[in-house]
């Protein structure tokens, strides 16, 4: 299976643009490039029934975030305070950075 590129990284603030969680904003917890999915904090929360373990002797029902497809999220720019597409630019020292397509600010 070919590895696909995902337009967001761990730690980015994103806005969910489609689905049952549309309009919610959160921080990316993890990225799964092989499946083009991201896990966003507070978005797509599901309940999982867990058996008692040494780590969690009580067991029971645990709420956790499930992954959503990366095409359903858009990077959120803090400067222009809106969702935006991502562009890439080279600085004078040759470093490659991501920039906001709306305001041109480095992300």
Curated annotation (Swiss-Prot):
Keywords: Ribonucleoprotein, Ribosomal protein, RNA-binding, rRNA-binding. SMART domains: KOW. It comes from the Bacteria. GO terms for cellular component: ribonucleoprotein complex; ribosome. CDD domains: KOW_RPL26. GO terms for molecular function: rRNA binding; structural constituent of ribosome. One of two assembly initiator proteins, it binds directly to the 5'-end of the 23S rRNA, where it nucleates assembly of the 50S subunit. One of the proteins that surrounds the polypeptide exit tunnel on the outside of the subunit. HAMAP family: Ribosomal_uL24_B. This is Large ribosomal subunit protein uL24. It comes from Pelotomaculum thermopropionicum (strain DSM 13744 / JCM 10971 / SI). The gene is rplX.
């Amino acid at each position: 299976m070919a590895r696909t590129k995902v337009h967001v990284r761990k730690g980015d603030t994103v806005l969910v643009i489609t689905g049952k969680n549309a309009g919610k904003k959160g921080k990316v917890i993890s990225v799964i490039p092989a499946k083009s999915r991201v896990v966003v904090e507070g978005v797509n929360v599901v309940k999982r029934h867990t058996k008692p373990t040494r780590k969690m002797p009580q067991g029971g029902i645990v709420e956790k975030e499930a992954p959503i497809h990366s095409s359903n999220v858009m990077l959120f720019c803090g400067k222009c305070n809106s969702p935006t597409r991502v562009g890439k630019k080279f600085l004078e020292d040759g470093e490659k950075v991501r920039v906001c397509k709306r305001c041109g600010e480095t992300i």
